Amino acid sequence: MVISKERGIYTQINSEKVATGSFYTEKATWLTSPVDKFLRFAFSEGAKIALDPYAGNGHLLQLIEQKYDIPSVGFDIKGFNGNFNDSLINIPIIDDAIIITNPPYLTNYSAKRKRVFYNVSKYFELGYEDLYQVALSCCLKSARFTVAIVPETFINSTFDK
C-alpha cells in the first residue's frame, strides 16, 4: 500500500484483515463506568445473553461472561467457535440478547485506496460511508440493546443517531 508516493513510502498490509475491517479488542478500556451502568440496566430489563456479531477472537465476550456471569454467543465472518456469519448482511436474532461488539471499521475511501474495495463494495450499496455504520444499522435492527465501540468520527458522521 502506498503511504506517500512523493517520499517513496510503502507498507505491507494484511489485505484480508483490512478488507474485513478487523481490529481486535483485547483490553477492557472500553468498559467504562457509563457502559457498565448501561449493561446493568439492560440486564435488569431482561437482556440475558451477550451477542457479538463481529466476535473476532472473542475477547469482548470473555470479559462479559467473567464480569457479569451471563452466557454469550459470537459470530464472525471468519468463524468464531464454529459460528460463521456475515453480520454486515444479517445478524441472527437471539431472544433476550444484548449486542456487545467492536464492529468492523473501513471507509469507502480507504477501501479504494488500499485496493480492497472489490471485497467490500456490496456493503456500501446502502449508502453508508464506513463499514461500522453498516454494522450499527444491522445491530440496531437485531436487538433491543446494543453496546458498540465506535470511532470518534461517528459524532460528526451522517449516521442517524
Regions found by a protein language model. Name each.
Residues 99-113:
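Short, solvent-exposed beta-strand-terminating loops
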Residues 1-52, 60-63:
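S-adenosyl-L-methionine
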Residues 127-161:
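Conserved Class I SAM-dependent methyltransferase catalytic core
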Residues 51-53, 69-76, 148:
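Short, hydrophobic beta-strand segments that form beta-sheet elements in well-ordered domains
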